[in-house]
Regions:
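Active-site-flanking beta-strand signature of metal-NTP-handling nucleotidyl enzymes
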Residues: 49-51
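Short, small-residue-biased leader/transition segments that mark boundaries at the very start
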Residues: 1-5
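Basic K/R-rich, polyanion-interacting modules in nucleoproteins and related proteins
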Residues: 7-47
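Polar, glycine-rich mid-to-C-terminal structural blocks
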Residues: 237-245
Length: 246
């Protein structure tokens, strides 16, 4: 791994065990994973959702894997009667302590937990059990890192983000997307399409929606009545993006 900018649409990113630097990797197995369950229609009446984190969904003192979740945890979830799992943020992220919410590579499934094919096998197995899979997708902000992330992509610190003073999130130590830019809208919408088509996720739970919708990011807001929700302090560009994504 060397300190070179990772392209914004890298679909596989790994960390060098010695240098700790993240680098893009070509993922082209001789036999790409083929889904056994070609089509899947989730049961939604009612939708019983089990929220989970791949790395923490086991009892051992280590980071869990896609395979371990598929082999050990999925059967227990099915046995308990759930028909949907919501996987907490798995887009590639440099800091594990962020639980996956400081994303650096938006098109890459975190290599901490295994390979892209192993994640596909997990989703395929869930569908075979009648379990829908929702992805906790992070489009509300991005990690500030410049080597691993988009913080200074192609030498432009504002290519994807608002300029100061709106560039940095006041509470999350991260960068805020500028939803008024066409390239940002296209980037994020194509990201949604990628996860649905490549991995066959059944839908999304959008993280940090309040932060996206309000200029205040919801900080210091009580939201006690309708006037608090519709007070004129909403970001119309963010509303437009979420409408398109939906």
């Amino acid at each position: 791994g060397s300190e070179m900018c990772i392209r914004d649409r890298a679909t596989r990113v790994v960390q060098d065990e010695q240098t700790k630097i993240f680098s893009a990797q070509v993922w082209a197995p001789e036999k790409p994973y083929k889904f056994k369950k070609k089509t899947f229609k989730p049961t939604t009446n009612p939708l019983l959702i089990y929220e989970c984190h791949i790395g923490m969904a086991q009892q051992e003192e280590k980071v869990g894997t896609y395979n371990e979740f598929r082999e050990k945890t999925l059967p227990r979830i099915a046995q308990e009667g759930y028909n949907c799992i919501q996987i907490m943020a798995i887009q590639e992220h440099p800091y594990y302590g962020s639980f996956g919410y400081h994303v650096s590579s938006f098109f890459a499934a975190s290599s901490r937990f295994g390979t892209p094919d192993e994640l596909k096998a997990l989703i395929d197995a869930a569908h075979e059990m009648g379990i829908a899979v929702i992805m906790d997708i992070v489009h509300s902000h991005a990690v500030k890192n410049e080597v691993e992330g988009l913080g200074n992509f192609a030498g432009d610190p504002n290519q994807y983000f608002y300029p100061a003073p709106r560039r940095e999130h006041p509470a999350w130590d991260s960068l805020c997307f500028d939803y008024g830019k066409n390239e940002v809208i296209h980037f994020l919408l194509s990201n949604c399409k990628y996860w649905l088509e490549e991995y066959k996720f059944d839908g999304f739970r959008f993280d940090g929606v309040t932060s996206m919708l309000y200029y205040s990011h919801g900080l210091g807001e009580a939201f006690c009545n309708y006037g608090d929700y519709f007070n004129g302090h909403q970001d119309g560009n963010a509303i437009c993006y979420l409408t398109l994504a939906n």
